[in-house]
Amino acid sequence: VLDKVGQDRGAALAFAELIAVDPSHPDVIAPAERVVLGFGADAEVMIALSASLLRVAEQRPPDEPPFEKGPAHLAAGAAQRCFEGLGAAERTDPAIGGYLQINLADSLRMMGPEHDEDAMQAYQLALAIDGNNGWWWFQLGLLHKWRGRFREALDANQKAFARLSRAASQASEGARPSLKPVLWNLAISATALGEGKLALEAWEQLGVRGSLSGAGLPYVADMPAMQLRVATLGEETGRNDPLPQKAVTFEVLWVQPLSPCHGVVQSPTVRRASVDYGDVVLWDGAPVRMNEVEGRAVPVFPLLWILRPGAEKRLRFVGMEKTRGTIEALAGELGDEVELSVFDRRTPDAEGNTIFYGKLLIAGDADLSRVRQALETALRARQGLTLAVPSLYELLGDTPAAGKAHQAWGGIERAAEKLGLLPRG
């Protein structure tokens, strides 16, 4: 089929069907370009091809940067040029001009925020052609959701739900559209807006029972821990990060769900991120992958929004110890308001010396002077353990002590370098 797609219309349509069924097919772009060259003015072929290319583009999670020139770009160009070649009657035909415009709009959405203005125009034109198509309203809602415009996302999904519900009531049982994606996005948008009652109504239609929390958000009890993927940048303090400071990467954090789409971050970030331990966050309903953790499949969801920053103070530290576990033993002496998280511990040398990095996680209402006293007392009682937490003294307004802590940080890293625990700078 692939060697004929640019000359044989049947082969072109068969190719579009192939990649719709198998969007991970390794050979897509070059044959698709030949189809566009051969049948760019054929609306049926371009509708099928652009829709299939969108399935390919969807294989890349929406929290990842789009390809500079990928399947969405090819679909957008094909749909746009074909639409421009239509006659007036075809342009306003939902089955022709309408589908070309919605495929163009979806392609532009997947190409990134810099194309949002053109995407909005394409969605508006598609809906002007056929405002009764519930799925087109749903797709407009996806654009608004991923750009953080949750009021507009809620409005679009409510319109989608009304139209698809009406279509479902008129269809035979086997032909009824699934309302699940729309209900999920209704719940997500309502949660983002603090409209907990509306979110609960959507969850209940999906068979999820919950209640309203004191904050007016949905609460579903006994949900298992899940994971959240967040983009991170380098931290300007410390040499534990092997990546360049401006390199963007992902970290996977544990979250405790409060509902199927929001919850509290339970692990601190290693690098700098928009979220951290204690934040209440919103995530999308489609996991980017599944992780196997202790025999359980754990979904990893992409971050959508921060609903409420946590009150906790997350203070970075660096330390060295001669006996493994000394720093963890110290944590028990800092009080119930303080947790200690070590996320990077280097392999010890022959004498057992090791360097480690982590964060102190301090309750928002904790007395920092008491934490300082407890920390300094515990450190004095432990030979072979050194720790530098400059930001603790900065928060206390003790500039001289903060300066000494910064110097201690550098001293710890230089000592680790001499021992071969860190690469030489």
Regions picked out by a protein language model, each given a short descriptive name:
Residues 1, 31-34, 48, 68, ...:
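"A position-specific structural signal for the A-helix of alpha-solenoid helical repeats
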Residues 2, 36, 53, 73, ...:
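Residue at a conserved register position within TPR or TPR-like alpha-solenoid repeats
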Residues 5, 39, 56, 76, ...:
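Structural motif corresponding to the intra-repeat A-B loop/turn of tetratricopeptide repeats
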Residues 8, 25, 42-43, 72, ...:
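TPR-repeat structural position
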Residues 18, 35, 53, 82-90, ...:
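Canonical positions in the second alpha-helix
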Residues 23, 40, 58, 94-95, ...:
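Short coil turns that delineate tetratricopeptide repeat
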Residues 27, 44, 64, 95-99, ...:
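Start-of-helix register in tetratricopeptide repeats
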